[in-house]
């Protein structure tokens, strides 16, 4: 399970329901859950069997999604406002259109032990964290991706992110480095060193 706490206010429709009301509707052993995410006003859970659950905290409605092509445990998941679900498993990364029930395998794989957070920016571009080693940028419209690898001495760890729109994406690493991502050039630069990452990578 993620090392995070998701605290959601219970809706008025659940006011008189027992504390285990939602758990019983999910009908799954909590020990099987592998990840959690709160997106599009729903709590999303992934489990070891490749199943995904959406829970409405306002009324307790639970939906279960079984995607036939996904058999592995869900490592991470993200759901966008447009109804696209992004999933990582040990077999790869996927985009799932909930409305059309259409699954697309993305052109990269992240090992389960390195699968970090998934998030999207102001321009609906998707970002995948690959452990402390890299960030993968994915453009859903153009179906393109780019991997930004970090030198070993400058791992990203639990970074902080600020989306500045046209100015770019700013990342602050635990080591105090400020990184700027240029969406037009698909380049990332260290602000406090003013040189691209490729200068530090081994030949």
PLM regions: where:
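Carboxylate-rich, polar loop motifs that coordinate divalent cations or form catalytic acidic clusters
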Residues: 1-203
